[in-house]
From Swiss-Prot:
<protein>
    <recommendedName>
        <fullName>UPF0102 protein NE0719</fullName>
    </recommendedName>
</protein>
<comment type="similarity">
    <text>Belongs to the UPF0102 family.</text>
</comment>
<dbReference type="InterPro" id="IPR011856">
    <property type="entry name" value="tRNA_endonuc-like_dom_sf"/>
</dbReference>
<dbReference type="GO" id="GO:0003676">
    <property type="term" value="F:nucleic acid binding"/>
</dbReference>
<dbReference type="InterPro" id="IPR003509">
    <property type="entry name" value="UPF0102_YraN-like"/>
</dbReference>
<dbReference type="InterPro" id="IPR011335">
    <property type="entry name" value="Restrct_endonuc-II-like"/>
</dbReference>
<dbReference type="Pfam" id="PF02021">
    <property type="entry name" value="UPF0102"/>
</dbReference>
Amino acid sequence: MSSAGNKGSDAEQCAAAFLQQQKLTLLEKNYRCRFGEIDLIMREDDTVVFVEVRMRSSDRFGGAAASITAAKQSRLIRTARHYLAGHEGDFPCRFDAVLISGNRENEIEWIRNAFDES
């Protein structure tokens, strides 16, 4: 049986592969700074895409989407700003979510613009 950390890593690998099939380019995995962590940082054309990956084996507590709380969104936004500050240029960006339902043979749902900075 996989540990929670291994399942999370497997989900991130699955999400990265899925997004690469959709023609996004992987820039970084598990970007960390003092504000938090971003699972995947991708690029689609000229847009930097910050991706939160969620895997849930059941929908009992609202499923994967419900686990991206306002507090989590705030941490992701601060972390993304930190990432962008370290890179020259003015890049458009967005926040996506990839939701993987482990109880349905890794059914993948990609939510573009899952939330914004406001």
